[in-house]
């Protein structure tokens, strides 16, 4: 793939996604942190806590890519840690055997959990713990997508990424952001499950497009674009266009779910309103952050509203 060229249109201004953009909210988020977008109506203390919570899903776990035993150990210790900090059942594990970066990715949750526990019910904490464990249990499976020389289908890959992308733990912090309590039963409806699923798909598909070059450079190719290339025998730019089509379809499904929620009359209106708004902001927060930062490409590579780069 090295040397091939790919083009990404301006998703922040794409006709399917454009209705989600709130320009004034983005102006308040000039420092490019997801938390400033999804917490735009929250107290500053909530924003700070949410920002620190992101350390769990933003840090680069590739540091353990070449040490499977260590990755499995980190996974086990992480599970014990979150049971201790959110479930208050287990003893805290000793993390000193891990690199400082990985220690801090967990230990910042001491403060995060204190704030969330003081503000929300035990049922709400159980929802958050469940989604964090769902993500953490996938930590030692990263970069095994092509194991045994098997190329997954796009459907298999997207299903796998629902777990490894770390979107669900972010969604599970929405009750904390909005100051509401929820139970797992209230979140088990078919529409709510579809909302989470399509939010996750949009986030990790968009991220895969933006991060392709960085992942190849880092030797971590857990990415939709190569999956599309290998399944369909197409070049990188064609696969990128197909990925854009998948994003459009997922965005349309998201809009359909929103309309269904708006036409339904239930006693969970406050909860559904909160999840709809923040899920939209999570998606566009990622897009905004990707365009304004230089983690994946330089501003000079944005030409006529498109990103043109060599892999």
Predicted regions and their residues:
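Alpha-helical, largely C-terminal catalytic domains
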Residues: 1-311
